[in-house]
Amino acid sequence: MKIMLISGSHRMNSQSEKVAHYMAQSLLDNGQATATEVFSLAGNPLPLWDEGIWNGDAAWQALLNPLSEKLAASDGFVILSPEWHGQVPAGLKNFFLLWGSGELAHKPALIVSISSSDGGAYPVAELRMSSYKNNRICYLPEHLIIRNVESVLNADASKNNPETDRYFRERIVYAGGILSAYANALKGVRESGITHSDVFRFGM
């Protein structure tokens, strides 16, 4: 089972990417995935959506096809978003506009919101409300909000708040188990063919 983790921060060396790499290893260590991969939006690797995607523009195909194949080969996702000005970063919202060919469809995704303080609730609400309609990604009812992120999940234990760090590590294992179970279950749903329709290609 492959789980792909999308680090939604535009920043280089971001806390979102730190958490993504920690979670990727946790999924492997706990037998919740057989393969993981982190795709980072640091540095804005994906241009803003335009009609060239629909028209088969060669430049878009060269950029997106390799990533499309990786997404299509994944059984589930972890979507990590920092909270910027109470919002999901523009690059992460743009990411969801690019996949209309079933790469994400009917696959489970765990939302992980990242906050440097006690916030983090707004990205969860925003992603659940407005990022799934046409790509049909399936968000779990479980989510994580990693608060005071600079003080947890650091490789250098001296930088961690021991109690908070332990809590988040345990909660990540719990959420990873749920994601893994959903990935197994929804694979059968997709393979049944019930989700495929040439008529109803877009959500309502």
State each model region's role.
Residues 1-97, 160-173, 186-204:
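N-terminal beta1-alpha1-beta2 submodule of the flavodoxin-like/Rossmannoid cofactor-binding fold
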Residues 34-35, 106-108:
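Short acidic capping loops at alpha-helix termini that bridge into adjacent secondary structure
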Residues 37-48, 101, 134-158:
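Mobile beta-alpha loop/short-helix "lid" or hinge segments that flank ligand
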Residues 90, 103-104:
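Acidic/histidine-enriched, beta-strand-rich ligand/metal-binding domains
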Residues 94-102, 129-134:
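A glycine- and small-aliphatic-rich helix-loop capping segment at beta-alpha/alpha-beta transitions
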Residues 108-152, 167-170:
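Short, glycine-/small-residue-rich phosphate/pyrophosphate-handling segment
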